[in-house]
Regions:
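Alpha-helical transmembrane segments and immediately membrane-proximal extracytoplasmic
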Residues: 1-164
């Protein structure tokens, strides 16, 4: 009986910790990752808040780690896009380049988490509506292939093969 109840306790603890993290550390709404990206593209010239580079991935990791039900796609896409957006903002890139960096972050995120570079490319072209030109396709493809390659290379590492340094 006690062991059966633990299956309910862990997700509740995870949601409680996530709620505390969002309320007292982030102090902003971090829900609906893809919607936030689309809003940033349409209303904020592609600028995504800095805390989105880390907040959604930490909150979803806590929830998933404790057995809660949350998808991994939206937080990782928001994180990748936020990294691209903030790098473009730091280096004062023009609007078109900033949008491309947001797309590269999203393509890399989807490709890395699903190990599918073409899916990352198609997701970015379809959902974020990046223009279908060679000057935008090439960086998106490079981002997606690089992310998928890095993801595959890291998931094949085993502790016994690396001397247990992982």
């Amino acid at each position: 009986d006690v062991y059966k109840r633990q299956y309910l306790v862990y997700p509740v603890v995870g949601i409680f910790l996530t709620g505390l993290f969002v309320r007292y550390v982030v102090k902003d709404d971090i829900s609906h990752g893809v919607t936030k990206i689309l809003y940033a593209i349409s209303r904020r010239q592609g600028r995504i808040k800095r805390h989105n580079t880390w907040s959604s991935i930490i909150a979803s990791s806590i929830t998933i780690g404790f057995g809660g039900s949350v998808g991994a796609e939206a937080p990782i896409v928001l994180t990748g896009s936020a990294i691209g957006s903030n790098l473009g903002t730091i280096f004062k890139m023009e609007h078109r380049t900033l949008m491309l960096l947001v797309g590269c972050g999203a393509a890399g995120a989807v490709a890395g988490i699903f190990k599918a570079p073409i899916a990352g490319l198609v997701f970015t072209l379809e959902v974020l509506m990046i223009d279908l030109t060679m000057s935008s396709l090439l960086p998106l493809l490079i981002s997606a292939v690089t992310a998928a390659t890095v993801s595959v290379s890291y998931t094949h590492l085993r502790a016994h093969e690396t001397g247990a340094y992982l």
